[in-house]
């Protein structure tokens, strides 16, 4: 971690201990050292004891990331709204600097303080 410029993680390592604690410690260590943090919440329902547990860990990841790549379905699951509003919540409430919401065959929505949409 000391030698990297960016640390990327996803929710698969947040499902169970001891991987969860190790991932959280790595993210916190990297943040203290000024590394860029990238997060991809990949909701795989069968891996979680409950959807509440999944949401809790996904939100932890969002609040600790600078760059977020999330699907439209995952954003809907967490925030109950469309991609533009979800991106605003991730930027403003969670503190990310850049959000990419994938939209399948419709391309993706990318937002920092300016936004654009591209077809795949």
Predicted regions mapped to residue ranges:
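Conserved phosphate-binding/catalytic region of the ribokinase-like
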Residues: 28-32, 83-120
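Charged helix-capping and loop-helix junction motifs
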Residues: 20-26, 51-59, 81-89
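Conserved phosphate-binding/catalytic loop of the ribokinase/pfkB sugar-kinase fold
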Residues: 1-21
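Active-site beta-loop-alpha junctions enriched in small/polar residues
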Residues: 12, 42-46, 73, 104
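Hydrophobic beta-strand scaffold residues
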Residues: 37-39
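Helix C-cap/helix->beta junction micro-motif
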Residues: 32-33, 64
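Structural recognition of alpha->loop->beta junctions
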Residues: 52-77
